[in-house]
UniProtKB/Swiss-Prot annotation:
Similarity-based family: Belongs to the peptidase S26 family.
Active-site residues (renumbered): S84, K162
Substrates-to-products reaction catalysed: Cleavage of hydrophobic, N-terminal signal or leader sequences from secreted and periplasmic proteins
Protein name in the entry: Probable signal peptidase I
Example of a GO MF term: serine-type endopeptidase activity
GO cellular component: plasma membrane
Organism: Mycobacterium leprae (strain TN)
Membrane topology recorded in Swiss-Prot or TrEMBL: Single-pass type II membrane protein
Residues spanning the membrane: 54-74
Main location: membrane
Subcellular location: Cell membrane
Cytoplasmic side: 1-53
Gene3D superfamilies: Umud Fragment, subunit A (2.10.109.10)
């Protein structure tokens, strides 16, 4: 009779018993193997993290670049700083004024027209009262200038908003018996609000001193605020030779007019506050002349 014996597994050696083990997915593995696996996992995750950071940096640069292109060539926001364009645009010193979007594309293919509401850089003679918005601290000022370059801080310039009344070659003037005229024809200005100005147009059609006639030089614009009594516009900045006679702006027209090259863009829409959302209309006051 043949005698059979079951195979008996050999007992673990002392070295196996002393070697630390770690359970991974329900399997006991030597600690050395687990450490190697962990190091391999870390080695894979670090390149992924670096890749994600690199992608984020690229996207951030692209976003800033697109924003810069938009501000430079397409459109830019602008804060209305004063009440000179009320009721069309609201603003005042120390309050939350309208924020508008300025279209910078239109005037690359056309010229400003009568009735357009434009944002422009004030000519040198208009900047005597301008106060820089930059810090006196040289370091902070450098940071502001850098942020301004990419559009996160407004440029340090005297940007103004007014309505175009007359363009190059046209003659503008105002008399108490005719009111405001261009080329001798009265204007229709529905954007003027006597209540806003607290004035009676029938009693004071010029809403200030009589002026002109002024023939606007080619390549320049005559601009005025919708809130005439509270607007330092072309009338205010035009040198006068007849002040003693109650007239203004009969001297050098270059002093009161604005170069077309100074125009930043056309006011298109009020984007803030929400209660004021809406378009900024161009009303040609010369229409029908």
């Amino acid at each position: 009779m043949t005698e059979t014996t079951d195979s008996v597994p050999e007992p673990p050696s002392d070295a196996d018993q002393l070697q630390p083990k770690v359970s991974i997915c329900g399997l006991d593995m030597p600690a050395e193997v687990s450490e190697t696996a962990a190091e391999a996992a870390i080695g894979v995750s670090e390149p992924k993290k670096r890749s994600a950071l690199w992608e984020f940096a690229i996207l951030a640069v692209i976003a800033i670049g697109l924003y810069y292109v938009m501000l430079t060539f397409v459109a830019r926001p602008y804060l209305i700083p004063s009440e000179s364009m009320e009721p069309t645009l609201h603003g005042c010193s120390g309050c939350v004024g309208d924020r508008i979007m300025v279209d910078k594309i239109t005037y690359r293919f056309s010229s400003p027209q009568p009735g357009d509401v434009i944002v422009f850089k004030g000519p040198p003679s208009w900047n005597t009262m301008y106060k820089s918005i930059r810090s006196n601290n040289i370091v902070l000022r450098s940071v502001q200038n850098a942020l301004s370059f990419v559009g996160f801080v407004p440029p340090d310039e005297n940007d103004l908003v007014k309505r175009v009344i007359a363009v190059g070659g046209q003659t503008v003037q105002c008399r108490s018996d005719t009111g405001l005229t261009v080329n001798g024809k009265p204007l229709k200005e529905p954007y003027l609000r006597p209540v806003t100005m607290n004035a009676d147009l029938s009693f004071s059609p010029c809403l200030g001193s009589e002026f002109g006639p002024v023939t606007v030089p080619q390549g320049r614009l005559w601009v005025m605020g919708d809130n005439r009594i509270h607007s330092a516009d072309s009338r205010y900045h035009c040198n006068s030779t007849d002040v003693v006679n109650g007239l203004s702006c009969t001297g050098d027209p270059n002093s009161g007019t604005v170069p077309v090259s100074n125009v930043i863009g056309k006011a298109r829409v009020v984007v803030w506050p929400p209660s004021r959302w809406g378009g900024v209309g161009s009303v040609n006051s010369q229409q029908g002349q």
